[in-house]
Amino acid sequence: MTADYGMNDNDDVVVWRSIAHASVSHRRVLVVDDYREAADALQLLLIADGFECRALEDPLAVCKLAAEWQPFAVVLDIKMPGLDGLELARRLRADPATSHMLLVACTAFSSADDRARAKAVGFDAHCTKPLTPQRLLRILEAATTCRAYEAP
């Protein structure tokens, strides 16, 4: 069943994956942005809304932490030094320990081509910066009540 987010391809948030009704066993979210202040600000927002959240600025640490901590969602910046969000999404999708996670691109790159690339590598949603926090919260809140999750 596809959730109705009231969004279209020109919106600041686009969701591609259908979400099946079920419940999430926890509300863990991993935020990854090489700009530490942005990651910390988003972490504070999510914690204030009742999520358990960790923020990373090192893209090279993402796959290991995601596999160990098992967040239900990973919010990734696209443009980062060393390893970009597109490659991180590919790696997270390729690993059975992380392939089930909700992947949200959070980026200033917002062209139709940018969104198509994000979708092609496995992102479930694309949020354009500057991010409308309420939109991201709507996606995560909907996912916590509408997405089946079982830790491997």
Task: Name these PLM-found stretches.
Residues 104-106:
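Hydrophobic/aromatic residues positioned on beta-strands within the core alpha/beta folds
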Residues 69-75:
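Active-site beta3 strand of CheY-like receiver
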Residues 129:
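A Lys-centered signature of the CheY-like receiver
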Residues 36-54:
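Two-component/phosphorelay signaling modules centered on CheY-like receiver
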Residues 80:
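Receiver (REC) domain active-site loop signature in two-component systems and cognate sites
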Residues 50-58, 62-65:
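Short hydrophobic/Thr-rich beta-strand motif most characteristic of the beta2 strand and flanking loop
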Residues 1-30, 43, 134-152:
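Non-catalytic signal-transmission and effector/linker regions of two-component phosphorelay proteins
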